[in-house]
Amino acid sequence: MAIFRDYSINPTEHDRTIGDRRRHRELVEKAIKDNLADIVSEESIIGESKSKKIKIPIRGLKEYKFLYGNNSSSVGSGTGNEKKGDIIGKEQMGNGSKGKGKGAGNSEGEDIYETEVTIEEVFSYLLEDLNLPNLDKKKYSEIVTDSSKKKAGYQKYGIRPRLAKKRTVIEKIKREQSRKRAIKELGKDDKVERLPFSEEDLRYHRIKEKPKKECNAAIMCVMDCSGSMDSTKKYLARSFFFILSKFIRMKYVNVEIAFISHSTVGREVTETEFFHKVESGGTYISSGLNTAMDIIKERFNPATWNIYGFYVSDGDNFTEDDERAIKSMRKFCEIANMIGYAEILPYSYSGTMKYKFDNYVKDKNFISSTIRNKEDLWPVLKKMLIKELKE
């Protein structure tokens, strides 16, 4: 006799692709992290929409199978230090090479596939565990970080997961009692049969989405656009702010971001100008910091707003402005939840502003880091976006 298994109870039991899809997602996540420096520092994606697609290489997965050796004296055993996905016995079975960028090789390579992901998907893999540090509850909260769903009454139509079982039973009992009263009023003594559930008994929870408000936050993005910031430095600075702005907009709703560029004079610019306009001239770091504080004074009262400052420069400041810059940074720290200062390619550490800020700005909400190449972008940003600053 044939036996048919009912998969309607748990339709995922026979879906053999679930594990494959999970493994594929893990491979995509690993590939994004391994190629992060190249992805986020690719200048062509700066300022692009979140739906723009980029390609990343993913190492292929092979089915398990037995492989015949080449009759060598060695065996294809591991050394004990292998990791998941490594090919065992590869080095022992020959001295061939794959030929990766340095001449032709004679060994079989790995299967590498390219998959397309959107910019939004890239950052969704990476930004889940990051938060604005020291985010305080302020008056007149406006930031919506999530939408909480709350039950708000009942309705006659809905989806099965929202079926209100208790309310449905009550409606059925009410219908039964109404029928009994009607029969009694008619003077009939007929035995009342048990009524089954009907569509008119069904009641579903009405769900109302309620915005979950937390705190106000204003982000000051300040970038040094002086003549000493060559194309490489500006490219790294823009990449840093591109990742930062994507994080802010994906993690928080209605957050305010101000973009400030400066040489000897600081001014607020549009986001497009910030990422694409080229400037020159000397460097007064204090001008950028003072412009940020002027904007805060005009639009963002620290009593009701969480203030964050992110400043990127090569640290090459005009000497007469050093003292003013240190003074401005101290003032900024007094009103801000956190200030992150990233210095790009310091050619002489003892003469740059990072060295001076580290020595004269002792506030706990001040974080300084160095960006020497594109591989440093992600670690520096992670350092600044810890949830709570250490005491």
Curated annotation (Swiss-Prot):
Residues 1-20, 75-109 are annotated as: Disordered. It comes from the Bacteria. CDD domains: vWFA. It holds the Pfam family DUF444. Residues 96-106 have a biased composition (Gly residues). Gene3D superfamilies: von Willebrand factor, type A domain. Belongs to the UPF0229 family. PANTHER family: UPF0229 PROTEIN YEAH (PTHR30510:SF2). HAMAP family: UPF0229. This is UPF0229 protein CA_C0580. It comes from Clostridium acetobutylicum (strain ATCC 824 / DSM 792 / JCM 1419 / IAM 19013 / LMG 5710 / NBRC 13948 / NRRL B-527 / VKM B-1787 / 2291 / W).
